[in-house]
Amino acid sequence: MASYEQAIGEICSSPYVIRGRITNEQTFLENFRSVTGADSSMTAIEDSNPDNWPISWSNVTAQYAVIEAREPMEVLRHERNQKLAECDKITLKYMSQNLPMPDEWKTYMQTLRDLPENCTPVLEASADIMAMHGKQLTSASVTWPTKPSSE
């Protein structure tokens, strides 16, 4: 799930500290500090003036939107990769016996590999589903290929 802290981490290459959860512009201004150096005891020198910071709230919200936009595809790839990993034992079985891989398995695996280019995944909007199962794709946004029954 996207977070403002993640967005900051992706766009801010300068040293910084976050002292609390960031949920809006006010908490960003209260909790974000740019680190400008260290004093003689090696304690960070923090700048609390937003005018001196390398990022602004608008930078953070723009990156947050980028993260949210890519999440459905990341979930799709994760689920797809799990399904491809399940195919490994089938592939090893045929390879270890010097047997040709059945066409239905080749097609199934290729269809899985092609999914990111062939669909536009959408995450479930239900808070209940997210709380119980984590991020899930809507069934209407992805047509998963049918796993061959023969092994």
What name fits each language-model region?
Residues 1-151:
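A preference for well-ordered globular domain cores
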